[in-house]
Every structure is written in structure tokens, then in C-alpha cells.
UniProtKB/Swiss-Prot annotation:
<dbReference type="InterPro" id="IPR015421">
    <property type="entry name" value="PyrdxlP-dep_Trfase_major"/>
</dbReference>
<comment type="similarity">
    <text>Belongs to the GcvP family. N-terminal subunit subfamily.</text>
</comment>
<dbReference type="GO" id="GO:0009116">
    <property type="term" value="P:nucleoside metabolic process"/>
</dbReference>
<dbReference type="InterPro" id="IPR015422">
    <property type="entry name" value="PyrdxlP-dep_Trfase_small"/>
</dbReference>
<dbReference type="InterPro" id="IPR020581">
    <property type="entry name" value="GDC_P"/>
</dbReference>
<comment type="subunit">
    <text>The glycine cleavage system is composed of four proteins: P, T, L and H. In this organism, the P 'protein' is a heterodimer of two subunits.</text>
</comment>
<dbReference type="GO" id="GO:0004375">
    <property type="term" value="F:glycine dehydrogenase (decarboxylating) activity"/>
</dbReference>
<dbReference type="InterPro" id="IPR015424">
    <property type="entry name" value="PyrdxlP-dep_Trfase"/>
</dbReference>
<keyword id="KW-0560">Oxidoreductase</keyword>
<dbReference type="GO" id="GO:0019464">
    <property type="term" value="P:glycine decarboxylation via glycine cleavage system"/>
</dbReference>
<dbReference type="Pfam" id="PF02347">
    <property type="entry name" value="GDC-P"/>
</dbReference>
<dbReference type="InterPro" id="IPR023010">
    <property type="entry name" value="GcvPA"/>
</dbReference>
<comment type="function">
    <text>The glycine cleavage system catalyzes the degradation of glycine. The P protein binds the alpha-amino group of glycine through its pyridoxal phosphate cofactor; CO(2) is released and the remaining methylamine moiety is then transferred to the lipoamide cofactor of the H protein.</text>
</comment>
<dbReference type="InterPro" id="IPR049315">
    <property type="entry name" value="GDC-P_N"/>
</dbReference>
<protein>
    <recommendedName>
        <fullName>Probable glycine dehydrogenase (decarboxylating) subunit 1</fullName>
        <ecNumber>1.4.4.2</ecNumber>
    </recommendedName>
</protein>
Length: 446
């Protein structure tokens, strides 16, 4: 597609074709008072060389993980991405936004999506998965709507240990649909089980949990699932896929629907996106899933083939009654996820998860030895942890920047009661020397 603006001759042809004499006549319905009178101040075009230098100067103003050592997490994670991921990802046959409606010319794309779905099912212990979602937050919101549809109930329980921005997206999706959201407090960095049990009744469609949660803590998912099921509700789990290299799968813990942010596999930080969400569920809920689903079948010659299946759920079939109203998906990001995870294999994933766990615990232990600093919550955590500090978190982060270290997230941004707390993330990308440098830098701050 050509993005060069129309020429004067082309404009005249368009106006003649639609029966309008001039541009002024075309825009006659727009009042003069709201029209821009002055010309836009747009500079002259740049040569390619000038443009590359200009964009390079702009990019140099950013602080990236190439130049700085970062301990930020909170939903976007720095992981090592092997070179084979981009080598395969950027092949021209994959590098397209085309939705594969015509299976006869889309077998490669369809098979790649099918493999993604298969990997998600293996990771989560679920029976079916879709082709991907926009991100982890929208996947969780769609899972909540699935739960309401499946149970015919209009209330969900949402712990405050779920990512605060995920909770914002939940409100955006659910409140206009008349779904009541009841937030459950936390205790020691995990869901307050007593408060949850009191809030549970036969009006609740689902209990939503995130494990590892926003604070990095492992929730008691199996116990929470049993409580939800006892009242006829569902258990929806948001998970970090890397953690599943060590932890029990959500399916083993009794989850009915599982979602998550897929960015940790194959997708760089990208200053916040694009990312991808995944959504998987038990077989009885598959027809309520949003998004595309690719299925395996056989052609008339008995050869294996792939097609978009269960399309009666989708908007191009059922319009406003559709279970799915997703206009696209994150297929290229999902392909990066698939390539990275396939390359790791079970053993590689387990090793990756083990490194994340060990390095985070080493970092937490060493920081906790510093005067005026301690681990805020006691309990099992994966690769994120909260540090309580007597020094201002902002002062700590500003001081660390002078060492080219990006420190933890100031939790007061989302939790006013945690104004002296920082959330740190340590992944396999950090060496012992990196962590020791962080600890030394924090130790200098008075």
C-alpha cells in the first residue's frame, strides 16, 4: 500500500467521482469557527541520512537495558532472547498482519498458531487455548467475562495482589457490562484467605488470582480454587509462564481458566509493547473463549491440515451475539513466544526458571542484610520481591541511577500504604557481580 498523499490531479478525480466541485464544498458542513486557519508548521523533508541521525539522537535520550542494569519488573520482564528467535521470526512468510481466513494459502501461519496453542496448553495444564490476546490484562478481563457467561452470575472477586493496571483494565471491561467487582485485601503480600472466604457466596462467578502475584509471592491457588468451587464459582489464574518451569501447572491446582502475559518468551521490553496475552481453559469452556482458534484436520486426500475452527463464536458470524469481539491478535508476538519456548524445551525452561528463582533469592537475602532494609513479606516468591526501607525509595532510585542502575518500582504509586517499599525483579540476565553492585550501591545511601 502506498502512503504518499494524493496529488492535485488525483484529488480532482476523486471529487469528480463523488460529485463535489471542490474541497471547500466537501468540507462545507464543518463550521468555519472550528477549522484550523493557520498552516501547520511542518519542516522540510529529511534525507535518509539526516533522518537516521535525527532518530538516533532522540533514541539516545532513552535509558535502556543495553546501557543500564535494570531491576524493574511489575509485568514487563527482561529475559535473554536467543538469536534464533529473530532469525526465524523475521522471515517474510511470517512477517504479516494477515488473518489466515483462507486455509489453502495459509498453512504455515496456521500451523505456527496451532503450535503456540499446543505449548500454552502444555504449560498451563488446560485442554484448549486460543491464538493469543492483546496482552495479559485484556486476557484476564476476557476470562472474567467468560466466567460470568458460564455461570450466569454477575460478580467477581479480585484480590488487591493482582497487578493494579490489570485491575484497571478489568474495571474498563466489566463495569459497563454490569459486572460487580469486589476487591479482596492482602495480608503478608498474599490474598487474605479469611476475607476471601467471607466474600464468597453463590452470586460469585469467579475468583481471580495472580500467582506469582504483583508482589512476586506465590498464592495458595489450590486452596482458593476449592473455596470458589464450593460455591459454584470458577477459579481464574493469571500466571507468569516462566514460573511454570518449576511450579505446578494451574491445571493441577484446579484452575478453570488460565491467562497470562506472554512477553517473557521471545519478546523484548520494547518500552511497553507490543506484547501478547494467552488464554486457555478446560474443554467445557472452549466454546466460550474469545479470539481465533486453530484446529487440526485432514483434507480430502487424508493429509493433515490446519483451519480456523469454532468460528460460530466470532463476530463475523454472530455479530453482537459473538463470544469473541477481537478484531486481530498478536500472531507475530505469539510466534516469537513459540520459537523461544520450543528452543528451550522442558529442560531449558526448568533451568531458566531455576536461575530466576535462585538469583532473586540471592538478591533479596543480600539487600535484606543492609541496615534499614528488610524483606517486606515472608513467604515463597519467584523472581520478584518487596523491600521495606527506612530511606526514601525515590532517593534510593536516584542514587542508583548515578551507577547506571535502574532500581525497583516505588510501590506507593499503586499502594499508598506501602510508601517505604520497593519492588525488585531479578531474572537470569543478572550475574552475581550485577547483584553485588546493586547491593553495594544501596549500601552507600544514608
Amino acid at each position: 500500500m502506498n502512503y504518499v498523499p494524493n496529488t492535485v490531479d488525483q484529488q480532482e478525480q476523486i471529487l469528480t467521482r463523488i460529485g463535489v466541485g471542490s474541497l471547500e464544498e466537501l468540507f462545507a458542513d464543518i463550521p468555519e469557527s472550528v477549522r484550523r486557519q493557520a498552516q501547520l508548521k511542518i519542516r522540510e523533508g529529511l534525507s535518509e541520512l539526516e533522518l537516521v541521525k535525527y532518530m538516533g539522537r532522540l533514541a539516545a535520550e532513552n535509558k535502556t537495558v543495553e546501557e543500564y542494569t535494570s531491576y524493574l519488573g511489575a509485568g514487563a520482564y527482561e529475559h535473554f532472547i536467543p538469536s534464533y528467535v529473530d532469525q526465524l521470526l523475521l522471515r517474510s512468510e511470517f512477517y504479516t498482519a494477515y488473518t489466515p481466513y483462507q486455509p489453502e494459502i495459509s498453512q504455515g501461519t496456521l500451523q505456527a498458531i496451532y503450535e503456540f496453542q499446543t505449548l500454552v496448553c502444555e504449560l498451563t495444564g488446560m485442554d484448549g487455548a486460543n491464538a493469543s490476546m492483546y496482552d495479559g490484562a485484556s486476557a484476564l478481563a476476557e476470562a472474567a467475562l467468560m466466567s460470568c457467561d458460564a455461570t450466569r452470575r454477575k460478580k467477581v472477586l479480585v484480590p488487591q495482589t493482582i497487578h493494579p493496571e490489570y485491575r484497571e483494565v478489568l474495571r474498563t471491561y466489566l463495569l459497563p457490562r454490569g459486572v460487580e467487582i469486589l476487591e479482596i485485601p492482602y495480608q503478608e503480600g498474599a490474598v487474605d484467605s479469611e476475607a476471601l472466604e467471607k466474600a464468597l457466596n453463590t452470586e460469585v462467578a469467579a475468583v481471580l488470582i495472580q500467582s506469582p502475584n504483583f508482589f512476586g509471592m506465590i498464592e495458595k491457588a489450590e486452596e482458593i480454587g476449592q473455596m470458589a468451587h464450593a460455591k459454584g464459582g470458577l477459579l481464574v489464574m493469571a500466571v507468569n509462564p516462566v514460573s511454570l518451569g518449576l511450579l505446578k501447572s494451574p491445571g493441577e491446582l484446579g484452575a478453570d481458566i488460565v491467562v497470562g502475559e506472554g512477553q517473557p518468551f521471545g519478546n523484548p521490553l520494547n518500552f511497553g509493547g507490543p506484547y501478547l496475552g494467552f488464554l486457555a481453559c478446560r474443554e467445557k469452556y472452549v466454546r466460550r473463549m474469545p479470539g481465533r482458534i486453530v484446529g487440526a484436520t485432514k483434507d480430502k486426500n487424508g493429509k493433515k491440515g490446519y483451519v480456523l475452527t469454532l468460528q460460530a463464536r466470532e463476530q463475523h458470524i454472530r455479530r453482537e451475539k459473538a463470544a469473541s469481539n477481537i478484531c486481530s491478535n498478536e500472531a507475530l508476538c505469539a510466534l516469537a513466544f513459540t520459537i523461544h519456548l520450543s528452543g528451550l524445551g522442558k529442560r531449558g525452561l526448568k533451568e531458566m526458571a531455576r536461575l530466576n528463582l535462585q538469583k532473586a533469592h540471592y538478591g533479596a537475602e543480600e539487600i535484606g542484610k543492609l541496615p534499614g532494609m528488610s524483606l517486606a513479606f515472608q513467604g515463597p516468591f519467584f523472581h520478584e520481591f518487596v523491600i521495606k526501607t527506612e530511606v526514601s525509595p525515590r532517593k534510593i532510585n536516584e542514587a542508583l541511577l548515578s551507577h547506571k542502575i535502574i532500581g525497583g518500582l516505588e510501590l506507593s504509586r499503586f499502594y499508598p500504604e506501602l510508601d517505604q517499599h520497593l519492588l525488585f525483579c531479578v531474572t537470569e540476565t543478572k550475574t552475581k557481580e550485577d547483584i553485588d553492585r546493586l547491593v553495594a550501591g544501596m549500601g552507600e545511601i544514608k
